[in-house]
Amino acid sequence: MRAGRGATPARELFRDAAFPAADSSLFCDLSTPLAQFREDITWRRPQEICATPRLFPDDPREGQVKQGLLGDCWFLCACAALQKSRHLLDQVIPPGQPSWADQEYRGSFTCRIWQFGRWVEVTTDDRLPCLAGRLCFSRCQREDVFWLPLLEKVYAKVHGSYEHLWAGQVADALVDLTGGLAERWNLKGVAGSGGQQDRPGRWEHRTCRQLLHLKDQCLISCCVLSPRAGARELGEFHAFIVSDLRELQGQAGQCILLLRIQNPWGRRCWQGLWREGGEGWSQVDAAVASELLSQLQEGEFWVEEEEFLREFDELTVGYPVTEAGHLQSLYTERLLCHTRALPGAWVKGQSAGGCRNNSGFPSNPKFWLRVSEPSEVYIAVLQRSRLHAADWAGRARALVGDSHTSWSPASIPGKHYQAVGLHLWKVEKRRVNLPRVLSMPPVAGTACHAYDREVHLRCELSPGYYLAVPSTFLKDAPGEFLLRVFSTGRVSLSAIRAVAKNTTPGAALPAGEWGTVQLRGSWRVGQTAGGSRNFASYPTNPCFPFSVPEGPGPRCVRITLHQHCRPSDTEFHPIGFHIFQVPEGGRSQDAPPLLLQEPLLSCVPHRYAQEVSRLCLLPAGTYKVVPSTYLPDTEGAFTVTIATRIDRPSIHSQEMLGQFLQEVSIMAVMKT
């Protein structure tokens, strides 16, 4: 892989050290066909590719997506959603950025990607992978338009490399680009999944009619999972864009529904009845046929409803998003103006109870949903992607972007998820007999546990309290999730806090003599409220050093984090802490900063409790404890108490006083 040659600009242009023009940004394991081009790919800036580069075209059709050598049709189909909404486009690509003709141009590009409940700003340079001087991955219909390849590069940076984008779900990319919801509709049904269905049923026809009302409001994508014999030109596991639908009156008076399909490959691969010059066009007026054929861009073709339902396997539909940021129901077109979200986790041995087949199901995370008025409600469980190995963490020293919402190379999402489901019970009041409630049939639930990043329920709910229980299929399967609620009416969402053994407030210390240190601190927005280790701002959290003295062996240490709020206050923040051991002699030059390394011990997942603590054995040495809230920019005050057992022989009085004395020595109180 070589760096591309071009004219050296008069001013130095930005080079992204966190995502360099190197093999590490292209490949993850050289497992895809992309590896064969390793020695031929060069990196060039847009002004080195063409004379007058532009971010956006004057004619939207010139910005149409085209796929290159990378197998990321799923992401490119989702990008087409941005072309339907100026609001979404401005949300993802902030307007006003200096471009190549501007004096302020410095060779950088910033966009926003929605990640696990937050819009994250990601900045990279504009050096793009090329073959023989041309873009080798995504490009627009006009090759002097660069919004798409630049956005693709940012998305590759979020995932760790371009190769990580090889294969994925359109629905996942749609959520990342809109912050909303997406649905996948199976066009074949259960019977058709085995290839036994030749003619579409009434449900599938109703689905296509429904798309007529959605085509201008949201992205519609379709895919082929396993092409029929004789239709191999569509490809396998390939995603397409449904760019238009038209309902026509045939010459014989019949109703004909046509769908215009765009192939991201940029070539017309359809050989059906409604191909250009196909016999299907004889069924409609010649002027109508001419008009529809003239609308086709490169890579587009028309297909009739019956053919579409026979040849395609699945539809993905993104929920419309208004300029105010509200989702719109696909089924009723009502606005889902009320939203709530809370994080949660399945922890092995504690809260990973498995599905309803397991006796441990009641130990799963549980949430109260209060519905104040009759509402159409969507409840979604979004899994946090598992992280790749920490070999990317060394790049964290070169973070780019907004400090409190920036992307962290230490948090590169993976593509492996647990099989998850969600069930909902209605209860009369919040104080319930939990085993009895969970033994009853739920009022709503997912049909099965699915290996999808996000699953959701759609419900028409009457006012009252509901118990929501997200679960993995297997017991003790760990994972983190975000529970999201979208509703037409007012709702509230709260977590049911389980009392854990190591989080009991005011737990007594074991017998013996203890030295106690109390450290007071606070989390402040934009300063010391860095959030959990999932966020790049984590190192800004308060950090307290402490030491364990030499002794005959490890010392027993209890660390307690107490947040300052009233016990009756329902607005507890989810809190936790990590303990890092400071290396003897200091950090080596090649090692990442201490807080970007793996902690020695942790008190996680973050819990909605006033106090969390952990009792541990620590060898002599220097340590740092970092208390944090789960989300960044969550303000609050706290006290960290570090109690260290003092190992020395007990002194007994020769005079029996009737009761031995236990000494507790208060060593220091530090305010920060």
From Swiss-Prot:
Active-site residues (renumbered): C73, H238, N263
Domain Calpain catalytic per the UniProt entry, residue ranges: 13-321
Protein keywords: Diabetes mellitus, Hydrolase, Protease, Repeat, Thiol protease
Region called Domain III 2, residue ranges: 513-654
Swiss-Prot/TrEMBL GO biological process terms: cellular component disassembly involved in execution phase of apoptosis; cellular response to insulin stimulus; positive regulation of D-glucose import; positive regulation of insulin secretion; positive regulation of intracellular transport; positive regulation of type B pancreatic cell apoptotic process; proteolysis; regulation of actin cytoskeleton organization
Span list, region Domain III 1: 322-494
UniProt KW Methyltransferase keyword: no
A single MF term (Gene Ontology): cytoskeletal protein binding
Tissue specificity annotation: Detected in primary skeletal muscle cells (at protein level). Ubiquitous.
CDD domains assigned: Calpain_III (cd00214), CysPc (cd00044)
Cellular component terms (Gene Ontology): cytoplasm; cytosol; mitochondrion; plasma membrane
PROSITE patterns attached to this UniProt entry: CALPAIN_CAT, THIOL_PROTEASE_CYS
Listed PANTHER family: CALPAIN, CALPAIN-10
Family: Belongs to the peptidase C2 family.
Function summary: Calcium-regulated non-lysosomal thiol-protease which catalyzes limited proteolysis of substrates involved in cytoskeletal remodeling and signal transduction. May play a role in insulin-stimulated glucose uptake.
Name of the molecule in the record: Calpain-10
Naturally occurring in which organism (per UniProt): Homo sapiens (Human)
Gene: CAPN10
